Amino acid sequence: MNKVIVTGAQWGDEGKGRIVDLLAEAADCVVRFNGGHNAGHTLVVGGKTWKLALLPCGLLRGKLGVIGNGVVVDPQALLAEIDRIAAEGLAITPDTLAIADNATLLLPSHIALDAAQEAARAQAIGTTGRGIGPAFEDRAGRRAIRLADLADPAVLRERLAEALRYHNAVLAALGRPACELEPMLAALLEQARRILPYLRPAWKLLSEADEAGRRILFEGAQAMLLDVEHGTYPFVTSSGTGPAQAASGSGLGSAARGHALGVCKAYATRVGGGPFPTELDDAVGARLREKGGEYGTNTGRPRRCGWLDAALLRQSVRVGGMSSLALTKLDVLDGLDELRICTGYRVDGVLRDDYPAGLAERGRVAPVYETLPGWQESTRGARSLDALPEAARAYVRRIAELAGAPVSLISTGAERDDVIRLADPWMPASGG
């Protein structure tokens, strides 16, 4: 197995960066294939804390980083991140980072549109306000500017003028000021000098690496329940977030044959608006938030917390074709007398094991819980299954049963090696 795809199995913030960092040790290159700079990772490497948004985590381990065509790239944010990481001691160069030349450019006008559209909604989605959605809208509407277009000032001017005609019409309709072409063009041309050396046909680079048997790790952003088609729509991101997106978002079709590793917390969290059937607005929810440090890496927003929803997790596993699960933050549950897992829902008195797609039905959902005993012992830092209390082992087993996927990794603390390895995602499944 030379390809592993790491994606979130809940609503994001599951600790994917930590798992990617763990697996990157055995990888040759690490690929970002979706999203933008709206999702961040906090990693501790060699006792030092790093915060990344656009850059692949594998760069911190000396691996080749690739930003694929499925990512929308804000050049200002990218260069600021490169400079910040360099100031912290890690130089990012065209030898260590490749960016797909056909990736979409995120513009200041996308950020203006994001703010205007969010303010105009009757019910806010809770976007990060970084322009991700409008950039993906432009890509679908064939107005997008690709990074390769930065190389030709005349083409860039023409494409930018076309995009701004549309953007400014929408901004005017929403009562917002227009964005000016000349200042934006000047800034892009200045940024182009630094960005162009990183551009490559990423699909070709990855195809050659795959043919040579190199190990390729795909680093997903957001999560399955934020997928634009299969998530809790419309409270979702604007792109595909599942393992299948790794193929189209990188240009490496064979990514679809890799090991799909879904990352999920031992409980559930969500940032911003949208359905959350198992949300806890009580002392237990507050405890999970504080003990789990549930605040956004990029935004600092407090996360909503609740019990694990195994019904939605099972949906993520099935829709995403997930091969196994990495369970994180098990130690946050230490000290609770009992735990609850949502196994399905009642809608108008009818029991069902799938979450409704219709907005009206969602408003009538009541979660159905299974109660399990908690544990008082500490699981923090446990590095073997035998080191866990029996109740914790039973909880992990039940999650795997309900989700329909084996648990291959369990994270039990903040240190990089606080992990129980039950199976190696890089190795072929037994019998396969």
Swiss-Prot record:
Domain of life of the organism encoding this protein: Bacteria
Binding-site positions, Mg(2+): 13, 40
Binding site for GTP: 12-18, 40-42, 303, 329-331, 411-413
Gene Ontology cellular component terms for the protein in this record: cytoplasm
Biological pathway: Purine metabolism; AMP biosynthesis via de novo pathway; AMP from IMP: step 1/2
Catalytic residues of the enzyme: 13 (proton acceptor), 41 (proton donor)
Cofactor binding note from Swiss-Prot or TrEMBL: Binds 1 Mg(2+) ion per subunit.
Cofactor(s) needed: Mg(2+)
Listed name of the protein: Adenylosuccinate synthetase 1
The species this protein was found in: Chromobacterium violaceum (strain ATCC 12472 / DSM 30191 / JCM 1249 / CCUG 213 / NBRC 12614 / NCIMB 9131 / NCTC 9757 / MK)
Encoding gene per record: purA1
